[in-house]
């Protein structure tokens, strides 16, 4: 794949494109091109799992292996909240309000949506031997968002676009830090914090 330095175009070259074994690689290459195009439209991608609760999308984010899918499944099992996307979520702001936009990339979960939802909030997970919700100071909120975004950052301008979006999004939505176990109580603690905030 070749991408113009200013991200204005991407060209995918594939030898033997009809070979079924190449399908997954082509799919992921197209995802990369999509990330570039989305960013040009002020849409940014957060590595996270999303659920639908109280009429809004809620995201669980954290580094790989933190338990994003596990936590979303705790909610699904206990509160019957549908999982919207199991790996990547597109975020944007329209008329001053944050939204989640569906997309067909979902990691190994095979769970995704192509529907748009208002964004309720984002929960950054951290494994711990206890379950406790903390609020984050505004400067840390933008930093946490930046750390989990997978939108391109290979030039200073692209990095600054991501940072500007994170700084704009943070005050428009609820952002939590959940120190948690992988037990059902973790979902109960987080649900109580969300319910209290809405």
Where on the chain are the PLM-derived regions?
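A noncatalytic interaction/capping subdomain that flanks phosphate/NTP-handling catalytic cores
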Residues: 1-64, 74-84, 89-198
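Conserved lysine of the Walker
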Residues: 68
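Hydrophobic positions on the alpha1 helix immediately C-terminal to the Walker A/P-loop
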Residues: 71
């Amino acid at each position: 794949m070749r991408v113009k330095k200013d991200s204005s175009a991407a060209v995918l070259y594939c030898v033997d494109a009809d070979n079924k074994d190449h399908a997954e690689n082509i799919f992921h290459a197209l995802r990369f091109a999509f990330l570039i195009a989305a960013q040009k439209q002020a849409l940014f991608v957060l590595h996270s799992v999303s659920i639908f609760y109280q009429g809004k999308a809620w995201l669980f984010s954290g580094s790989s292996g933190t338990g994003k899918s596990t936590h979303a499944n705790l909610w699904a099992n206990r509160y019957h909240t549908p999982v919207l996307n199991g790996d990547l979520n597109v975020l944007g702001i329209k008329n001053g309000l944050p939204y989640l936009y569906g997309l067909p990339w979902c990691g190994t979960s095979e769970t995704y949506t192509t529907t748009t939802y208002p964004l309720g909030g984002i929960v950054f997970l951290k494994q711990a031997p206890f379950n406790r919700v903390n609020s984050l100071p505004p400067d840390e909120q933008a930093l946490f968002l930046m750390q989990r975004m997978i939108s391109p950052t290979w030039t200073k301008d692209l990095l600054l676009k991501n940072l500007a979006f994170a700084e704009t999004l943070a005050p428009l939505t609820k952002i939590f830090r959940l120190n948690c176990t992988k037990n059902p109580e973790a979902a109960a603690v987080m649900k109580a914090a969300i319910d209290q905030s809405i």
